[in-house]
């Protein structure tokens, strides 16, 4: 299987601290890339949250520390990261099926591996650190010849998931509560 998963990458306290930093941060509607960056709430209903530099640094170091393990898992050298994005999906939030790979001319880097660090749990009711829905759905993982067969991954706080950036994927709608996650991309 071509999905890397590392439960317990962040402990419960670490997840809570990042969620608290997100609560203090400034949230803006997340953009999509279609030849340029635009907000389209029919495709993505998510917020990018600007957090303090200390929190960004903690996450950057954690991701840098796991990069060699992820490189080994995928069998390729990954030498850099784009930088973490802190995403908040409120009730009704989603991100339709898309690719993370940006291979258009003029892009300095080509995303090769996508990272998602879940900060909330799904399926245990709602409240601090919990939501309903918001599953990560990956296509073409179970059988690459059948790109329509999905693999659904339920958010579990502290779990890091990595997959190739060319895989079609989406975030299913959050039906109750808030889904928080951190994303990044290795090159």
Where are these regions (language model features)?
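Fe(II)/2-oxoglutarate oxygenase catalytic core
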Residues: 1-162, 166-187
């Amino acid at each position: 299987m071509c999905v890397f998963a590392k439960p317990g990458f962040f402990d419960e306290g670490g997840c809570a601290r990042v969620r608290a930093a997100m609560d203090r941060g400034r949230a803006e509607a997340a953009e999509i890339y279609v030849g340029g960056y635009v907000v389209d709430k029919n495709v993505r209903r998510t917020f990018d949250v600007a957090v303090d530099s200390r929190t960004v640094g903690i996450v950057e170091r954690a991701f840098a520390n796991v990069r060699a393990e992820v490189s080994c898992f995928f069998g390729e050298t990954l030498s850099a990261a784009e930088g973490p994005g802190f995403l908040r999906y409120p009730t009704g939030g989603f991100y339709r099926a898309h690719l993370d790979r940006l291979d258009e001319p003029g892009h300095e880097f080509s995303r090769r591996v996508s990272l998602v660090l879940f900060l909330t749990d799904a399926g245990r009711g709602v409240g601090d650190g919990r939501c309903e829905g918001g599953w990560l759905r990956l296509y073409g993982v179970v059988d690459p010849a059948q790109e329509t067969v999905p693999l659904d991954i339920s958010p579990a706080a502290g779990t890091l998931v990595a997959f190739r950036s060319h895989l079609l994927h989406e975030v299913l709608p959050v039906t109750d509560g808030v889904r928080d996650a951190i994303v990044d991309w290795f090159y």
